[in-house]
UniProtKB/Swiss-Prot annotation:
GO biological process assignments: amino acid activation for nonribosomal peptide biosynthetic process; secondary metabolite biosynthetic process
Cofactor(s) essential for the protein: pantetheine 4'-phosphate
Pfam families xref list: AMP-binding, AMP-binding_C, PP-binding
Organism: Pseudomonas syringae pv. syringae
Protein name per UniProt: Syringomycin synthase SyrB1
Domain Carrier: start-end pairs: 535-610
Length: 614
C-alpha cells in the first residue's frame, strides 16, 4: 500500500509543494485524462468525467450570463447529490466562490449566511428557502436548459493562492457564525500533500458522507476528483443508519471512507454482524479526539493493514487536515488516546506559550499552524483576523488555534484540551457563546452557561444551565419547550442543548468567571417533554423506556416523546439499540425510527420482530 511510513517525518527534508492551482483546472485535466471514468454518482444517476465537465462548463456559461464574474459569491442550497458537485464546479469555472448553505440549517442561520456573505445569487429550491428580498434563487435544471454560451477564459493573471474557492461558516463566540475564506491554492496544496502520504489513484471510490457545510466534504469531493477517482454520494437515509451504511460501503466498493470517531462507533457495531467483503483501502478519522477503544474491536476483526486506519487533526481555518497518523495495532495498546501524528508536508506546527514563545520540549503549549493550509481569513471579521491570524517572528503568518498540544519525543503531537471555552462534538467546533447568546434572546432566560457532559462511550451532549428570568419556580415545561423551539429556529441540530438545568444564579469564582466545579449534574435538568406515564405499557415499551431513562439519562421520557427532542443524540440511539439487540436477540437499525423516533415506534417494531422470530 503506497502510504507514508509513520516512523518518518512527513515534513522534514521533503520537496517543497508546487505553487497553488485552480481546483476546476485540476478537474479539467483529469477529465481530459479519464473522460469515460465515473466522476460522481448518487442514488439516482451517474456522470462520467466528460459529462460532468460538459455540464459544469455549460453551467459556468449560464452563471456568467447571470452576472457571475471573478470573486462573485454564489450560494448553494442543495443536499448531497450529483447536482451539488455539478454546481460547485460550475461556480468555480465561472470565476466565482461557492458558499455552501446546508438545507438542514434553520431559517435564521440561512439568513445570516446570506446577509454576511452578501449573496445575491443562490442555486437551490426557492420553495424551501427563506424569503430574502435581495436574493435571487436559481434552479439548476432551468439554468442548464437554456442555450449554452462559451464562458470567458480564466484570467491567467489571477493567483490561485489569492482566489477564494469557498467560504464555510463555523460557530462564532459572539453569537453569530463566522465565514472562513479558503483559497484554491490552500486546497490544491492539501491535495498534493495528502497524495504524498496516501498514494490515491483513479480506481479509488470516495464516499461523500458529510454535509457540504462541514469541511470534511471538501476533502471527500476534491480528494476524488483531483486523482480521477469517483465521488459516491451517500444517500441521506443511509448516512443515518450504520447498518445500511455498512452494506452500502460493500455494494459501492468504497475505497476511501472518512468518519468522525462518533460515527465510526456505529459503523463498527454494524460491521460485527455483516460479512459482506469491503474494498476499503483507507478509513480516515478526524474531527474529534480518537480513543483507542474505538478502533480495537475493528482491528481485532480486520487487522491494521487493509484498510489502513488514519487519524488526522485539522481545522477549517487551516484547510481540513493538518496532521497524519497511520494507526497500527500496537498504538492501541500503549495509550488511551490515539496521537495526532506529524504535520503534513507544507504545514508547520508551533507550540507557544502566552507570550508566543516556544515552550520547552514535552511541555503543553498552544498550537499555531503555519504553511500551505492557512486560510485567507474570516469574512467581515477584521478584529478577529488580527487576533487569530497572527504574524510570528520572521514575518511568518500563522493561525492561532486555541488547541493545547504536547510534542512527544517521537515527533508526534497529542491533544491536551482547549485554552478557551470552545467545545467539540461530533466533529463540529462549537462556540458556547453563540448558543448562550441565542438562549438569552428568550424572555424566559436571564443568564445562561453552556457546557458539555459525557454520558459514556463518547456520547457528548450539550447542557444549558439557565437562570430563568422570573425565577426557578417559573421554569415550567412550557418555558422549556418554548426555549427549545427558539433554539430550533436559530441553531443547527448539533448546536442545540440536550438538557436544560435551571439555576437561581450561575456560580462564579472570586475572579468573576463561571465556577464549573459548582455546576450541578445534568441529571438535575429537564431534557424531556413531560413525565413518563408507565401505566398500561407493554413489556417492550417499558423496557425501551427503562434503557433510555436509566442507561442514557433521559429521565421521565414518555412513550410518545421524540427521542431527539428529549435530549437524545445519534450516538446515544446507537448505544440503546445495541443494548436492545442484545436483550431481545433481534436485529435493530436506526432506520426503523424514520417515521418517528419514539419508544412506542421502537417497541412496536421489537414486538413484530419477536412474533416473526417465533
Amino acid at each position: 500500500m503506497p502510504i507514508t511510513n509513520t516512523d518518518e517525518s512527513l515534513s522534514a527534508a521533503s520537496a517543497p509543494l508546487k505553487p497553488g492551482a485552480f481546483l476546476h483546472e485540476i478537474f479539467s485535466d483529469r477529465a481530459r485524462q479519464f473522460p469515460e471514468r465515473t466522476a460522481v454518482s448518487d442514488a439516482a444517476r451517474t456522470l462520467s468525467y466528460a459529462q460532468l465537465d460538459a455540464l459544469s462548463t455549460k453551467l459556468a456559461a449560464r452563471l456568467r450570463d447571470e452576472g457571475v464574474t471573478y470573486g462573485t459569491r454564489v450560494g448553494m442550497y442543495l443536499p448531497r447529490s450529483v447536482d451539488l458537485v455539478t454546481s460547485l464546479l460550475g461556480i468555480l469555472k465561472a470565476g466565482g466562490t461557492y458558499v455552501p448553505v446546508d438545507p438542514q440549517y434553520p431559517g435564521k442561520r440561512v439568513e445570516h449566511i446570506v446577509r454576511d456573505s452578501e449573496l445575491s445569487l443562490i442555486i437551490g429550491d426557492a420553495a424551501n428557502l427563506p424569503k430574502i428580498s435581495s436574493l435571487r434563487v436559481l434552479a439548476l435544471d432551468e439554468l442548464l436548459s437554456a442555450p449554452a454560451l462559451q464562458p470567458a477564459a480564466q484570467d491567467t493573471r489571477i493567483d490561485p493562492n489569492n482566489s477564494t474557492a469557498y467560504i464555510i461558516y463555523t460557530s462564532g463566540s459572539t453569537g453569530e457564525p463566522k465565514g472562513v475564506q479558503v483559497s484554491h491554492g490552500n486546497v490544491s496544496r492539501l491535495l498534493e500533500s495528502t497524495q504524498r502520504a496516501y498514494g490515491f489513484n483513479a480506481q479509488d471510490v470516495w464516499s461523500m458522507f458529510h454535509s457540504i457545510g462541514f469541511d470534511f466534504s471538501v476533502w471527500e469531493i476534491w480528494g476524488a476528483l483531483a486523482h480521477g477517482g469517483q465521488v459516491a454520494v451517500v444517500p441521506y437515509d443511509i448516512s443515518r443508519s450504520p447498518a445500511a451504511l455498512r452494506q452500502w460501503l460493500a455494494d459501492q466498493r468504497i475505497t476511501v471512507l472518512s468518519q468522525t470517531p462518533s460515527a465510526f462507533r456505529g459503523l463498527d457495531e454494524a460491521d460485527r454482524g455483516n460479512t459482506a467483503p469491503l474494498a476499503l483501502r483507507y478509513v480516515v478519522l478526524g474531527g474529534e479526539a480518537l480513543p483507542a477503544s474505538v478502533l480495537r474491536p475493528w482491528v481485532e476483526r480486520h487487522g491494521d493493514q487493509k484498510p489502513a486506519l488514519i487519524n488526522m487533526y485539522g481545522i477549517t481555518e487551516a484547510t481540513v487536515h493538518t496532521t497524519f497518523k497511520r494507526v497500527l495495532a500496537q498504538d492501541l495498546e500503549t495509550a488511551a488516546m490515539v496521537s495526532l501524528g506529524k504535520p503534513l508536508d507544507g504545514w508547520r506546527l508551533h507550540l507557544l506559550d502566552a507570550n508566543q514563545a516556544p515552550v520547552a520540549a514535552g511541555t503543553t503549549g498552544e498550537l499555531y499552524i503555519e504553511g500551505a493550509g492557512v486560510a485567507q481569513g474570516y469574512l467581515n471579521r477584521e478584529a478577529l483576523n488580527v487576533e487569530r491570524f497572527v504574524e510570528l517572528p520572521g514575518a511568518v503568518r500563522a493561525y492561532r488555534t486555541g488547541d493545547l498540544m504536547t510534542l512527544e519525543s517521537n515527533g508526534e503531537y497529542r491533544y491536551a484540551g482547549r485554552c478557551d471555552e470552545q467545545l467539540k462534538i461530533s466533529g463540529f467546533r462549537i462556540e458556547p457563546g453563540e448558543i448562550e447568546a441565542s438562549l438569552q434572546t428568550s424572555p424566559s432566560v436571564a443568564a445562561a452557561h453552556v457546557g458539555v457532559h459525557d454520558y459514556g462511550d463518547g456520547d457528548l451532549r450539550l447542557v444549558a444551565y439557565v437562570v430563568p428570568g422570573q425565577g426557578v419556580d417559573a421554569w415550567t415545561e412550557q418555558a422549556r419547550s418554548e426555549v427549545a423551539a427558539l433554539m430550533a429556529e436559530n441553531l443547527p441540530g448539533y448546536m442545540r442543548p440536550s438538557v436544560y438545568v435551571p439555576l437561581a444564579e450561575l456560580p462564579v469564582t472570586h475572579h468573576g468567571k463561571i465556577d464549573k466545579q459548582q455546576l450541578p449534574s445534568p441529571a438535575a435538568g429537564t431534557a424531556l417533554s413531560g413525565a413518563a406515564d408507565v401505566k398500561g405499557l407493554s413489556e417492550q415499551e417499558h423496557f425501551v423506556l427503562k434503557v433510555w431513562s436509566e442507561d442514557l439519562g433521559l429521565k421521565n421520557i414518555g412513550v410518545n416523546d421524540d427521542f431527539f427532542d428529549s435530549g437524545g443524540t445519534s450516538l446515544a440511539l446507537i448505544r440503546s439499540l445495541s443494548k436492545l439487540k442484545t436483550h431481545y436477540k433481534i436485529n435493530l437499525d436506526p432506520g426503523i425510527l424514520a417515521d418517528g423516533a419514539t419508544a412506542k415506534v421502537l417497541a412496536d417494531h421489537i414486538t413484530r420482530s419477536l412474533v416473526q422470530a417465533h
